């Protein structure tokens, strides 16, 4: 995965060098590390549900604000690889998470309002996460490149909570946050995103009747990411145990989760568009 990340950045860097003389310094001066433009759009068009455990998106509102959305994406595209590589890991992650989420909204708008699911943007031969249409770091990247090639690359960030930060425009996905990710608050933001998702009983819960833990399919797909030792956690069961108070109500059930003596079932994933209804 490290080699994959280097390949992505080197490929992007080759293209970046061609235009570095003309736009690199300007991009360095103009880039807003607070991602204020993205926060403004999110605060306008993200609706919190269930006490902030989930969210829906006003895609119609984003469609009306397509120009500022594209301007924000253009600002991200203007950042040269050399500038990005000089940032802190937190600043890099915030940049990539915001780029992923804003690009996903833009992708939805290409077919909205006819679209009922992001999966409709794919085909039998390709998923919507594969095309390399996103201008970033001097090259063309796909959503998969950003998430799996950069954010999830082994030995780089090793941050499993990325799964609670990137949003796939679907009801089953962890919520689209109502503000941009920013470097100076990233640990707190990721902690809150995790708490929100784990407390949402529609997607993660202890089933008292069946005496088993029922988790989002995300943990089935990416369970290995929770074995890397982040915050001392080296197993999915240990991660669940750390969130026992959000997954269960009864003290006995919470104690069982913390003991690790339980089975896990994964819930079906809802790919319906997370549009405001």
Residue ranges and their predicted role:
Residues 30-86, 90-94, 104-277:
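Interaction/scaffold regions that mediate signaling and macromolecular assembly across diverse proteins
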Residues 97:
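Surface-exposed, glycine/proline- and aromatic-rich loop segments on solvent-exposed faces
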Residues 7-26:
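N-terminal export signals
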